[in-house]
Curated annotation (Swiss-Prot):
<feature type="modified residue" description="Phosphoserine">
    <location>
        <position position="10"/>
    </location>
</feature>
<dbReference type="GO" id="GO:0030246">
    <property type="term" value="F:carbohydrate binding"/>
</dbReference>
<feature type="topological domain" description="Cytoplasmic">
    <location>
        <begin position="1"/>
        <end position="82"/>
    </location>
</feature>
<feature type="topological domain" description="Extracellular">
    <location>
        <begin position="104"/>
        <end position="1383"/>
    </location>
</feature>
<dbReference type="InterPro" id="IPR039477">
    <property type="entry name" value="ILEI/PANDER_dom"/>
</dbReference>
<dbReference type="GO" id="GO:0005509">
    <property type="term" value="F:calcium ion binding"/>
</dbReference>
<feature type="region of interest" description="Disordered">
    <location>
        <begin position="1"/>
        <end position="76"/>
    </location>
</feature>
<keyword id="KW-0677">Repeat</keyword>
<dbReference type="InterPro" id="IPR055401">
    <property type="entry name" value="CEMIP_beta-hel_dom"/>
</dbReference>
<dbReference type="Pfam" id="PF10162">
    <property type="entry name" value="G8"/>
</dbReference>
<keyword id="KW-0326">Glycosidase</keyword>
<feature type="site" description="Essential for hyaluronidase activity">
    <location>
        <position position="248"/>
    </location>
</feature>
<keyword id="KW-0472">Membrane</keyword>
<dbReference type="GO" id="GO:0005730">
    <property type="term" value="C:nucleolus"/>
</dbReference>
<keyword id="KW-1003">Cell membrane</keyword>
<feature type="site" description="Essential for hyaluronidase activity">
    <location>
        <position position="303"/>
    </location>
</feature>
<dbReference type="Pfam" id="PF15711">
    <property type="entry name" value="ILEI"/>
</dbReference>
Length: 1383
């Protein structure tokens, strides 16, 4: 609608009468109003037209004809005008419709797309680094081209949107020092329902030593203040997956090959396996000098099997003695055309295929002149392995500057193909990916670049670079060790612009590169923040608060905080970061999902102050987490000792106890949720739960209603940890919450050992305990601990540990558990000592050695002497049950045991530790080991070492039911019928056992000597816990209903406390304590409440006149002092019940206090006088049981496989393939399917057809082909294998030729296999329109077997064409939904 203005001016547009220029109340930035015409103006029916005659009356006279003629004329004119208007209107309508349809067909507006908001104006600020931009109310900008500015502030309704187009062809880079989004401001790149298609890059530039910092945010940042909106949504892509097939170093299963030598005279020959690219034979034939060498070459070629690849290169000269028969053999079998005319010192190279004819032969010759051939004679052929990997074989020969050179290469051609677990069709050529280490060193992670690969399936990619390390892509020994593969590239990039090297005050003594990157910081009360599928590169600074993504003191960011759309980060790629990945600081309820953190400094996923709760970390990947400088816990050893600004005085930090804790997931409060995450390589720990005594940092002073130490654990489900040095999972410790001072000079926030996790209902210690459930943890290739878990009630279940220095260690406390009555349990779990993941030397792997199982070289967790343990007993009480142990075999250098104990243990070990329903595989040589003096164990003489013990409840460890296992030299627990197991350094005894906790006052460096009356020649000397302390403590394990005497290596203590620990009601022992003859005593007993330190029911012990009186009334409170021997005798008898796992009775800890008065300073050792007077003949209180026979029913975990995709079903398949010698010995051949053995002893081939869509598995057919019938297998393969079937084949004995190569190719191999003269053949294939990554062919040379092979095959996959009757239950998704609900 418009009105006519002055003549010659354009029409002036007017506002519609029903509209206005302001936003509607429901306007949402980024939501676009659909394109449609404005409504017509309202019809004002009440308006009146005034007759012109009323203003200027006039009279005109016409004849009737004249009057009629103008009337008719006007009527015709109106009709004409009506037609013209109609025509124009119609034409305009169709033109407009065509335009609209044309526009719609090109780029249909979408109200979900922020860049299609019709109110936006295109904006091009140009390239001006001095321009300060303020986008304010009324400024609604669409950035359409590259720009460089100084800074951008968006405020008061201002809006900045990155332009996009339908085909994603825009490529917009915005360079700025910072972007500050203030109240009412918004920055949008894409939206959740309209993801950005083009490439958008925000580059944050500037140096740390130029210009002043902005308040709060500093430099090089995107900052979101209260009321600000940041919405970044890139193209949705698979963030990370895992390998589905092992990626070998160099891309080939047997590695690449390279050889070069000068003056290697004659014909140098290599024979290469056409199926695997393995160099089989390496020979040199001096056909220049010797005719016999020519004959030997002829026979050598005659013996080669058809299809073998042969490479030949001349060294120096080869023709003088080259016989015609040999030349003919080369022509006939390799198709050479140049060998016949080869001359003196001519360079010649050939690559051909035996019996492949001239079409498969590539050869080259160069003439020799003046000691040179003027270049290389180069021959090359390209081939494919059975896995479909393309490789090349190269041979070359030349003379250069008078030197003869010849050589060979076998390597990858046209890129390496990766087989992945998930659909990665959204990954594109040019993208960067990272493949995680599957060895001890996190530095074996590799960055690779994707190539175009039209032949790849949806789960395959091809990479440009040659892998340097082995990356496992299999389930090995029942444990998922498949390497994580993460996509680093995103189409929205936020990056820091970096200098070439470190400068200014940026810790250049530790880093030789620039670490002053950009950062994104979000402040409290933001309006909306959602980041998805964004790449953050070169972000973070080695300065506090400057992290790639930092939610800073935001409080509750979910519905509890009033957000209808809770804040989230999803699908981010944070890599090459200079300070952390995602920092959650004083923020609760944040969802962090599908995010990768790679190659970062300091804790990666970082919960900071100990107040962060309800945050959800779902399916995130962190790897290559390196030390940083910010906090003591970030630092490595050198940083720790050098950075001393935060300590008091001249204190030098101790790296192992103050620092060295950098972790991929740093969880500072237990009430957070971790589901489906992978911590795939950190300098110290993968996942670390720590417990703050009080809020720290900027949250200091907040009053938490619930103490973290007492708060129940959030969801922990299906997380994996590997390639970490200190621990995969670490649940223990806290940080120091006080400033450095003279009394404690350590730095604020350094590691602190005072925290104890003891979860209770509502975080109230007076309410019932709540067990922390660690469900489905996979921990492998961690140098020290797979998992170290300290706390109250904790249950580890459905978990797997492999190739760790120590699989799992539970800890509670040194003397008494902090959480009285608590215990720890591991159940339904698998422990593997040395798996078939042999590792790969390199990438900072420090330790190599020989394996105990098969004596093959392998990487080791520590040095060659380090004792490997599966489950490590420490403190207690713990319960190990329903678990399986495999492959713990010592070597001459080291011990390896399924169950072991903490080494150099000065603390207590309770006899209430117990084991039941455990299973040991055939390759377990040491079920348990108690240590011996030597490397790592040192003298093995600390108090905890000597008192190591556990209860074998059902005999599943020892074969003796209801017995206790202790160290062999411990005579406090023995009786005559105990069974010694020398190789365990153990003794197995029946009986009942408890502990006496002895504490003395003012007696530093005093050792206690305790002797059982039955074994006076075998006393136990205890140094005491904290021996240098004023009040040392001792805690021997004792057999009940026996007598003991206690002596000292110095003057007797004046005050001694004896606590009855783990005594049930009426349990007793008699003790005699050594004192000088002139000592007087006051002995009392009471019940100590350890929670508050109160003492109740105090009674005095009365003196007895004789030993006989004392013995007749053992239940009364009496003592007897034998001044002749110096022994004060009394009975320690429990008078109250003990509940559950409580160390003390339900009334408190029964404590006897002895006050001794004497002026003697003599050493109080009464051994010589006490015995033989008080000697007793050794006897058993409880009869030793008979040894069990038969298999342990119900022992071990019922799970055969532990994977990171537990919603999938995997079928364990095991082949036992003996060679000729084993067959002659009578060993059977076996195919085992899910534990069911199919055995055969006749020569031939066994074929099993398994339904790929049935769970549980179903064998459709079992078919045996004897040697005479093997020729019929081809026909069977062609006609009888139904679709959607798994094909399992194993041969036995000599089969000269299997005619099934073509059939195996149809069942999943990339080409027909070479099956001539094989000792054994094992094949796993699939019948269907899909080639799974698990299809494999194994062969061995003639007369050799393949040993034991194990594979785990997925069942009921959609790719197989299975029609599932019901949807797969995803417990992880159920738990995610549960966590998202705010209570």
């Amino acid at each position: 609608m418009y009105a006519a203005g002055s003549r010659g001016h354009s029409p002036a547009f007017l506002q519609p009468q029903n509209g206005n220029g302001h936003r509607s109340p429901g306007y949402v930035p980024g939501k676009v109003v659909p394109l449609r015409p404005a409504p017509p103006p309202k019809n004002h029916a009440s308006a009146k037209l005034t007759s012109r005659s009323q203003d200027a009356p006039a009279t005109f006279a016409f004849s009737p004809e004249e009057q009629r003629t103008p009337s008719e004329s006007r009527k015709r004119k109106r009709h004409k005008n009506t037609f013209i208007c109609f025509a124009i209107t119609s034409f305009s309508f169709f033109v407009a419709l065509a335009v609209i349809l044309g526009i719609s067909s090109k780029y249909a507006p979408d109200e979900n797309c922020p860049d299609q908001n019709p109110r936006l104006r295109n904006w091009d600020p140009g390239q001006d680094s001095a321009k300060h931009i303020v986008i304010k109310e009324g400024d609604l900008f669409r950035l359409t081209s590259d720009a460089t500015v100084d800074s951008i502030v968006i405020q008061d309704g201002g809006l900045l949107v990155f332009g996009d187009d339908k085909d994603g062809s825009k490529n917009i880079t915005l360079r700025t020092r910072y972007i500050l989004i203030q109240d009412g401001g918004a920055l949008h790149i894409g939206a959740e329902k309209c993801r950005y298609r083009s490439k958008a890059t925000i580059t944050l530039y500037g140096k740390s030593d130029e210009r002043e910092s902005m308040p709060i945010f500093g430099k090089k940042f995107i900052g979101v203040e209260a009321g600000g909106t940041l919405e970044l949504h890139g193209a949705q892509r698979t963030s990370w997956t895992m390998l589905a097939r092992t990626l070998h170093s160099s891309g080939l299963p047997f590695g690449s090959y390279a050889f070069e030598k000068d003056f290697s005279r004659g014909l140098n020959v290599r024979v290469i396996d056409q199926d695997t690219a393995r160099v089989l034979e390496n020979e040199k034939f001096d056909t220049h000098e010797y005719h016999n060498e020519s004959r030997r070459l002829q026979e050598f070629l005659r013996a080669q099997e058809p299809g073998r690849i042969v490479a030949i290169a001349v060294g120096d000269s080869a023709v003088k003695s080259l016989l015609q028969g040999t030349i003919q053999m080369i022509q006939d079998r390799l198709g050479s055309k140049l060998i016949q005319g080869l001359g003196y010192r001519q360079a010649w190279a050939l690559v051909g295929v035996i019996d492949g004819g001239s079409s498969s032969c590539n050869e080259s010759v160069r003439n020799y002149e003046n000691h040179s051939t003027g270049g290389k004679a180069l021959a090359q052929g390209e081939f494919y392995t059975l896995d479909g990997q393309k490789f090349s074989v190269t041979a070359y020969s030349e003379w250069s500057q008078g030197i003869s050179l010849s050589g060979f290469r076998v390597d990858i051609a046209d890129g390496v193909k990766l087989h992945l677990l998930d659909d990665v069709s959204t990954w594109e050529a040019g993208d960067r990916i990272v493949v995680a280490s599957t060895d001890y060193s996190m530095y074996q992670a590799e960055e690779l670049t994707l190539l175009r690969c039209p032949e790849c399936s949806r789960s395959q990619v091809k990479v440009k670079e040659i892998p340097q390390y082995l990356h496992v892509g299999e389930i090995i020994d029942g444990i998922d060790m498949r390497a994580e593969v993460g996509l680093l590239t995103r189409n929205i990039v936020i990056q820091g612009e970096m200098e070439d090297s470190c400068y200014a005050e940026n810790h250049c003594q530790f880093f030789d590169y620039d670490t002053f990157g950009g950062h994104v910081m979000i402040e409290k009360n933001f309006t909306s923040v959602h980041l998805s599928y964004v790449e953050l590169k070169h972000m973070g600074q080695q300065h506090m608060g400057r992290y790639p993504v930092h939610f800073h003191l935001c409080g509750d960011v979910d519905s509890k905080g009033g957000y209808s759309q809770p804040a989230s980060v999803d699908g981010l790629s944070v890599h090459h970061s200079f300070s952390r990945c995602i920092t959650v600081h004083g923020t609760s309820g944040l969802l962090i999902k599908d995010t990768i953190g790679f190659d970062t400094l300091g804790h990666c996923f970082f919960l900071e102050d100990g107040v962060e709760q309800r945050n959800i970390l779902y399916h995130n990947l962190g790897l290559l987490t390196k030390p940083g400088t910010l906090l003591p816990t970030d630092r490595n050893s050198s940083m720790c000792t050098v950075m001393r600004d935060g300590v008091f005085g001249n204190y030098v930090p101790v790296p192992t106890t103050d620092c060295m804790a950098v972790s991929t997931f740093w969880i500072a409060h237990p009430n957070n949720h971790l589901i489906n995450n992978a911590a795939a390589g950190s300098q110290d720990a993968g996942i670390w739960y720590l417990f703050h005594k009080e809020p720290t940092g900027e949250s200091s002073g907040l009053q938490l209603l619930e103490k973290p130490e007492l708060t129940p654990l959030g969801i922990f489900y299906n997380n994996r940890v590997h390639s970490n040095f200190k621990a995969g999972l670490f649940v223990d410790k806290g940080v120091k919450t006080t400033n450095a001072s003279a009394s404690d000079p350590r730095e604020y926030l350094c590691l602190d050992n005072s925290a104890r996790f003891r979860p209770h209902q509502d975080a109230d210690p007076e309410k019932p305990r709540v067990a922390a459930i660690i469900d489905r943890l996979i921990a492998f290739k961690n140098n020290d601990n797979g998992a170290w878990v300290r706390g109250g009630d904790i249950i580890v279940q459905n978990s797997a540990f492999a190739d760790n220095g120590k699989g799992l260690t539970f800890a509670s406390d040194g003397s008494f558990p902090s959480d009285e009555g608590s215990s720890q349990e591991v159940t339904e779990s698998l422990f593997v000592g040395e798996s078939r993941n042999y590792g790969f030397q390199g990438g900072q792997n420090k330790y190599m050695g020989t394996g105990g199982i098969d004596q093959k070289p392998r990487t080791l967790p520590r040095n060659r002497t380090f004792p490997i343990r599966g489950f490590q007993i420490y403190d207690g009480p713990i319960h190990l049950t329903k678990s399986t142990f495999k492959k713990y075999v010592p070597t001459p250098d080291r011990y390896s045991s399924a169950i072991g104990f903490l080494m150099k243990n000065s603390w207590q070990t309770t006899p209430r530790n117990n084991v039941s329903l455990v299973k040991f595989g055939p390759q377990v040589s040491l079920n348990v080991f108690f240590g011996k003096p030597g490397p790592w164990f040192e003298d093995c003489e600390l108090d905890g070492d000597k008192n190591s013990i556990f209860h074998d409840i059902d005999g599943s460890v020892t074969g003796y039911k209801d017995t206790y296992v202790g160290r062999m030299d411990n005579y406090l627990i023995r009786h005559p019928n105990c069974v010694n197991v020398t190789k365990w350094n153990a003794v197995i005894c029946s009986g009942t056992y408890a502990q006496v906790y002895v504490q003395t006052w003012n007696t530093p460096n005093l050792s206690m000597i305790i002797t059982r009356d039955e074994y006076p020649s075998h006393p136990m000397v205890l140094r005491g816990i904290n021996q240098r302390a004023i009040s040392p403590q001792y805690q021997p394990v004792v057999m009940l209903e026996k007598g003991y005497t206690i002596h000292w290596n110095g003057p007797a203590p004046r005050t001694t406390f004896l606590y009855l620990v783990n005594f049930n009601k009426d349990d007793w022992i008699r003790v005699g304590l050594c004192y000088p003859a002139n000592t007087s005593f006051q002995v009392t007993v009471g019940f100590l409440q350890r929670q508050n330190g109160s003492l109740s029911r105090i009674e005095d012990y009365e003196p007895a006149r004789s030993m006989e009186e004392l013995q007749k009334k053992p239940s009364e409170r009496k003592f007897y002092f034998d001044s002749g021997t110096g022994l004060l005798f009394l009975y320690l008898r429990a008078h109250s019940h003990r509940d559950g796992h409580s160390y003390c009775s339900s009334q408190g800890c029964e404590r006897v206090k002895i006050q001794a008065a004497t002026d003697s300073k003599d050493i109080s050792n009464c051994m010589a006088k006490a015995y033989p007077q008080y000697y007793k003949k050794p006897s058993a209180v409880k009869r030793m049981p008979a040894m069990l026979t038969g298999l342990c029913q119900g022992c071990g975990t019922h799970q055969m496989v532990f994977t990171s995709d537990p919603h999938k079903s995997y079928l364990p398949v095991r082949f036992q393939s003996p060679g000729k010698a084993e067959i002659q010995r009578g060993d059977p051949s076996i195919i085992s399917v899910n534990g069911t053995d199919f055995t055969f002893r006749s020569a031939g081939a066994l074929l099993l057809i398994v339904d790929a869509c049935s769970v549980p598995f179903r064998v459709k057919e079992k078919r045996m082909f004897l040697s005479a019938d093997v020729s019929h297998m081809e026909e069977y393969f062609k006609a009888s294998i139904p679709p959607r079937s798994i094909v399992l084949l194993s041969t036995r004995g000599e089969i000269k030729q299997l005619n099934i190569s073509d059939s195996l190719a149809v069942l999943g191999l990339a080409k027909p296999a070479h099956l001539y003269s094989k000792g054994s053949v094992v094949f796993l294939g699939f019948s269907g329109n899909f080639a799974p990554s698990w299809t494999k062919l194994f062969t061995s040379p003639d007369e050799q077997g393949l040993g034991v092979l194990e594979q785990f095959l997925p069942l009921q996959m959609e790719e197989y064409g299975c029609s599932r009757t019901g949807s797969v239950h995803r417990r992880d998704l159920d738990l995610l939904q549960q966590a998202l609900k705010v209570l």
